[in-house]
């Protein structure tokens, strides 16, 4: 692990104009989905959950928010934005593999968001998935504004720390561009915003038209193997990682999953269980809880915004280079040099004078969240960083 501290001298713009967007939902627009209860027997952390309807009011236009906290007065409040197909619901209930519980047990209150995707059932009819055509990054950032307003109302804080993993990191940067005055700091968990070496500009209208021609508005995490086969593999590993594999090439089902994840995005890119960085059983518990579908249009948004310093027709990067907000970045090396450089570039050029980089050597993407050393190499530094900047 390498940790680098860097100051970037940037001048904050004299006036930051508020985004012309709809006002966040009022506190009474949220409904309690689960009253406060312990997350697990013997845990000092409790959970409360809420849901809120979002426009235009379709069957899946609902977001959720989970609060994780221990007893006593929190030292800080953090809003957590999950990665693609992830949610704010607990997949892992041990703090050694869950940043939210680690922070909450130490006095940092965590609000974790459920995107609209969490309301979409795995067996949703294909025609119902067309609702995702309007679930672009701007729509999700508006949902984040609503969740942030609720977190501020519940916590009594004017500013929140905002953390995001993977695509959640992209959305954290985007949200900070929209409401910088409400962000105390960004905890970026293995995700970029702007490319350090941009390729050609992406024509968003043409890309969306091409997507519309396919009619495939939702990406399916089940991939070529299918959703049920994916889920069956995860459940088998959770039940007994030393049980028999469905593929004769492996001695155990745990070894089978380890190899699938080791090679999914290239050697050690998605995760590095064969290198001992993560445990297949822990990874299975994380992955089995994924939401099946995610809006494909957001892949286009990511390409459009990353390719230019100020992408046209979006306000999600309008303050890029002028974000005078502390940034803490953790980035894996398993996804290659371009990934590392793009993540570093995004953090360094956001506009902050207070940027800390942590390069996690030998880690894959998911290992940043649930690796066997994540508690000491990610969670503890994140706790110390937030604590030092809490007001």
Label the model's feature ranges.
Residues 71-118:
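Short, surface-exposed "cap/lid" segments of acyl-processing enzymes
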Residues 354-391:
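Catalytic active-site module of serine/aspartate enzymes centered on a nucleophile-bearing elbow/loop
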Residues 155-166:
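Alpha/beta-hydrolase fold nucleophile elbow
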């Amino acid at each position: 692990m390498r940790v680098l501290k860097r100051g970037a001298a940037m001048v904050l713009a004299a006036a930051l104009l508020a985004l012309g967007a709809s006002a966040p939902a009022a506190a009474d627009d949220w409904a309690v989905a689960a009253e406060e209860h312990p997350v697990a027997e013997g845990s000092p952390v409790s959970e409360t959950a809420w849901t809120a309807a979002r426009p235009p009011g379709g069957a899946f236009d609902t977001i959720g928010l989970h609060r994780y906290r221990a007893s006593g007065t929190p030292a800080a409040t953090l809003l957590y934005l999950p990665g693609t197909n992830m949610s704010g619901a607990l997949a892992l209930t041990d703090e050694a593999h869950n940043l939210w519980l680690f922070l909450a047990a130490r006095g940092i209150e965590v609000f974790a968001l459920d995107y609209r995707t969490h309301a979409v059932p795995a067996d949703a009819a294909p025609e119902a998935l067309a609702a995702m055509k309007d679930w672009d990054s701007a729509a999700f950032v508006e949902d984040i504004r609503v969740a942030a307003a609720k977190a501020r109302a519940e916590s009594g804080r004017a500013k929140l720390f905002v953390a995001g993993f993977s695509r959640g990191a992209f959305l954290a940067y985007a949200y900070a561009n929209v409401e910088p005055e409400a962000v105390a700091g960004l905890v970026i968990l293995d995700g970029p915003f702007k490319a350090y070496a941009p390729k050609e500009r992406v024509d968003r209208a043409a890309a969306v038209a091409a997507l519309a021609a396919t009619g495939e508005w939702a990406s399916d995490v089940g991939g070529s193997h299918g959703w049920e086969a994916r889920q069956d593999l995860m459940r088998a590993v959770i039940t007994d990682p030393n049980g028999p594999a469905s593929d004769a090439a492996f001695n155990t089902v745990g070894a089978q999953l380890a190899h699938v994840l080791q090679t999914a995005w290239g050697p050690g890119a998605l995760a590095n269980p064969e290198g001992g960085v993560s445990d297949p059983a822990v990874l299975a518990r994380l992955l089995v809880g994924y939401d099946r579908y995610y809006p494909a249009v957001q892949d286009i948004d990511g390409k459009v915004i990353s390719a230019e310093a100020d992408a046209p027709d979006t306000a999600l990067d309008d303050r890029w280079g002028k974000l005078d907000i502390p940034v803490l970045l953790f980035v894996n090396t398993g996804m290659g040099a371009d990934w590392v450089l793009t993540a570093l570039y995004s953090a360094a050029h956001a506009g902050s004078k207070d940027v800390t980089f942590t390069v996690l050597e030998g880690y894959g993407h998911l290992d940043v969240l649930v690796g066997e050393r994540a508690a000491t190499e990610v969670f503890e530094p994140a706790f110390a960083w937030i604590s030092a900047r809490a007001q």
